[in-house]
C-alpha cells in the first residue's frame, strides 16, 4: 500500500492511495478465513467449507468490503502519521472506478483541508467588565403590578356602556365562508379580551364600541398561512351577539395575590420576584460579557482558515438570514442564496472563534457530560408537549441534532474556563443600561 502526496498548499492536502491487487486479495482471504468457522454449506460440516469454495461464492461480495477496509486503513494510518486533522470529511474518489477490474491495483485520490495550527492565548491578558444589576424595589413593584394585571378580574360595566380596548366581552358567534357555516367556527358564551390578539387579525377591532345585546357582523380574511388549509386566505363573516361587556379590575397586591402564585405571603412573593429578576439580569449580563470576550479573542489571534468551512458557514448564514426576512417561506423551494461580503466576514469570524474555542477545550480536556446532555434534551423536549418521548427517540437516532445540542454547552464551558483566567471587574449599573447593552448586541 502506498500513499503519495500530490498537493500541500497552505491547508490544502491531496494524496494518491494505491492498494495493490495482492494486498486486496490478501484482505479478501483474511475475511474469508474470519467468516469460515460460522458458514454452513450443503455437504460440509459447519466451519469445514473449503476456502476455495467460499471464495467462489462469497469473494465478489467481500471484495467491496475489503477495498473499503484497505482504503479506510490507509487514510487512518496517514492521518495518525501526519498528525493532520481534516477540517471536514475528506473527499475520496476512486480513479477509473467505472472501468476497474478485479486483479488490478486500486488507486484512490483523497483531498481535504487540514485544521490549522492555532496559537495559544494568554488568558491573563484578557480584561473584561461584568455588568451587575440589583433587583431594586421599583423593579420588584413593577413586576408585582404586571402579575396583578395578569391575575385581573372583570366586572360588568353599567348597562349601555360601549366596549373599550382591554375590556372583556362575552359573545355568541357563528362563522361562515361563502354563506356556509364551517366546523369550529361557532361558540357560545365566549369570553374575549379586546386587544389581546387571540382572534383572527381584524376581528377584535370590529367589536370595540359594541354594547350588550348588539348584533355585530364581523368581516375578516383568514391569514394565508392559517393552520386550517381549507380556510387559509378565505374571506369569512362572523355573526356575533354581545352578551356582556366587562371592565378589567386589577387584582389587589396583597397576600391573596401571593397565594395565587404559590407564595406563602406577599413578602415571600417579593423575594421570589427579586430572585427571578436577578437571575434574568445575570443571564443578560453574561451574554454581554461573552460577546465582549469573543470580540477580544478575535483580535488576539490570527491563523489561516479552512476555505471550505468558511464557505459552508457563509452559505448557512445567508440562508438563515434570508428565511428570517421571508418568514412566509418554510421550505427550500427557492433559488440559490449567494452570501454577501458581510456574510463572508461574519463566517470568517465564527469559524476563527469556533476553531479557537474548540482547540482550547480540546487541550483542557473539556467534555460535555451525559447529565448535561440529558438536561439539554429535556429543555428542548418541553417545546413539544405530549411528544417528549418521540423527541428523545429522534435525538437518539440523529447524531447531527446531538451535536447541535452539545456544541453550545461545550462552548459555554470553554468560555467559563477562559473567564477563570481572565481579569474581570464588576460594574454596578441600572437595568436600563443593561437593556441598552443587550440591544447593542443585536446591532453588531
Swiss-Prot record:
Where in or outside the cell? Cytoplasm
Q: Which domain of life is it from?
A: Bacteria
GO CC field: cytoplasm
Q: Which InterPro entries match?
A: PPIase_dom_sf (IPR046357), PPIase_FKBP_dom (IPR001179), Trig_fac (IPR005215), Trigger_fac_C (IPR008880), Trigger_fac_C_sf (IPR037041), Trigger_fac_ribosome-bd_bac (IPR008881), Trigger_fac_ribosome-bd_sf (IPR036611), Trigger_fact/SurA_dom_sf (IPR027304)
Q: Which UniProt keywords apply?
A: Cell cycle, Cell division, Chaperone, Cytoplasm, Isomerase, Rotamase
E.C. designation(s): 5.2.1.8
Entry keyword annotation includes Cell cycle: yes
Its BP terms in the Gene Ontology are: cell division; protein folding; protein transport
The cross-references to Pfam families, in alphabetical order and at most eight, read: FKBP_C (PF00254), Trigger_C (PF05698), Trigger_N (PF05697)
What is a single molecular function from GO for this protein?
peptidyl-prolyl cis-trans isomerase activity
Keyword ATP-binding, does the record have it? no
Its recorded reaction(s) are: [protein]-peptidylproline (omega=180) = [protein]-peptidylproline (omega=0)
- Domain PPIase FKBP-type: from-to ranges: 166-251
The record's annotation in SUPFAM superfamilies points to: FKBP-like (SSF54534), Triger factor/SurA peptide-binding domain-like (SSF109998), Trigger factor ribosome-binding domain (SSF102735)
Question: So what family is this one in?
Answer: Belongs to the FKBP-type PPIase family. Tig subfamily.
Query: What is this protein for, i.e. what is its function?
Result: Involved in protein export. Acts as a chaperone by maintaining the newly synthesized protein in an open conformation. Functions as a peptidyl-prolyl cis-trans isomerase.
Note what the entry says on domains.
Consists of 3 domains; the N-terminus binds the ribosome, the middle domain has PPIase activity, while the C-terminus has intrinsic chaperone activity on its own.
Q: Give the protein's recorded name.
A: Trigger factor
Amino acid at each position: 500500500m502506498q500513499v503519495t502526496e500530490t498537493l500541500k498548499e497552505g491547508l490544502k492536502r491531496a494524496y494518491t492511495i494505491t492498494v495493490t491487487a495482492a494486498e486486496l486479495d490478501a484482505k479478501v482471504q483474511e475475511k474469508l478465513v474470519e467468516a469460515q468457522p460460522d458458514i454452513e454449506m450443503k455437504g460440509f460440516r459447519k466451519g469445514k467449507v473449503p476456502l476455495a469454495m467460499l471464495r467462489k461464492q462469497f469473494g465478489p461480495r467481500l471484495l467491496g468490503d475489503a477495498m473499503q477496509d484497505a482504503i479506510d486503513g490507509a487514510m487512518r494510518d496517514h492521518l495518525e502519521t501526519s498528525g493532520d486533522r481534516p477540517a471536514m470529511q475528506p473527499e475520496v474518489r476512486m480513479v477509473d472506478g467505472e472501468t476497474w477490474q478485479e486483479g488490478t491495483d486500486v488507486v484512490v485520490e483523497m483531498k481535504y483541508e487540514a485544521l490549522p495550527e492555532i496559537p495559544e492565548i494568554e488568558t491573563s491578558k484578557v480584561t473584561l467588565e461584568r455588568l451587575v444589576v440589583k433587583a431594586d424595589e421599583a423593579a420588584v413593584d413593577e413586576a408585582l403590578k404586571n402579575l396583578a394585571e395578569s391575575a385581573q378580574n372583570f366586572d360588568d360595566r353599567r348597562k349601555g356602556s360601549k366596549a373599550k380596548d382591554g375590556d372583556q366581552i362575552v359573545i355568541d358567534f357563528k362563522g361562515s365562508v361563502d354563506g356556509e357555516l364551517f366546523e369550529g367556527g361557532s361558540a357560545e358564551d365566549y369570553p374575549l379580551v379586546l386587544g389581546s390578539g387571540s382572534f383572527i387579525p381584524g376581528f377584535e377591532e370590529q367589536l370595540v364600541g359594541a354594547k350588550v345585546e348588539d348584533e355585530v357582523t364581523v368581516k375578516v380574511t383568514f391569514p394565508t398561512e392559517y393552520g386550517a388549509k381549507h380556510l387559509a386566505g378565505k374571506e369569512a363573516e362572523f355573526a356575533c351577539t354581545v352578551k356582556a361587556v366587562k371592565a378589567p379590575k386589577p387584582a389587589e397586591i396583597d397576600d391573596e395575590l401571593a397565594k395565587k402564585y404559590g407564595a406563602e405571603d406577599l413578602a415571600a412573593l417579593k423575594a421570589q420576584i427579586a430572585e427571578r429578576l436577578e437571575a434574568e439580569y445575570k443571564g443578560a449580563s453574561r451574554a454581554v460579557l461573552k460577546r465582549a470576550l469573543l470580540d477580544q479573542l478575535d483580535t488576539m489571534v490570527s491563523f489561516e482558515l479552512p476555505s471550505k468551512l468558511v464557505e459552508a458557514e457563509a452559505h448557512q448564514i445567508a440562508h438563515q438570514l434570508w428565511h428570517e426576512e421571508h418568514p412566509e417561506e418554510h421550505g427550500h423551494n427557492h433559488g440559490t442564496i449567494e452570501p454577501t461580503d458581510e456574510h463572508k466576514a461574519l463566517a470568517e469570524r465564527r469559524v476563527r472563534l469556533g476553531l479557537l474555542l474548540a482547540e482550547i477545550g480540546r487541550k483542557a480536556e473539556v467534555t460535555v457530560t451525559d447529565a448535561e446532555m440529558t438536561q439539554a434534551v429535556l429543555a428542548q423536549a418541553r417545546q413539544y408537549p405530549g411528544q417528549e418521548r418521540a423527541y428523545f427517540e429522534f435525538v437518539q437516532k440523529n447524531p447531527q441534532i446531538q451535536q447541535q445540542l452539545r456544541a453550545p454547552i461545550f462552548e459555554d464551558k470553554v468560555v467559563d474556563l477562559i473567564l477563570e483566567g481572565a481579569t474581570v471587574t464588576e460594574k454596578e449599573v441600572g437595568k436600563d443600561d443593561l437593556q441598552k447593552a443587550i440591544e447593542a448586541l443585536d446591532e453588531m
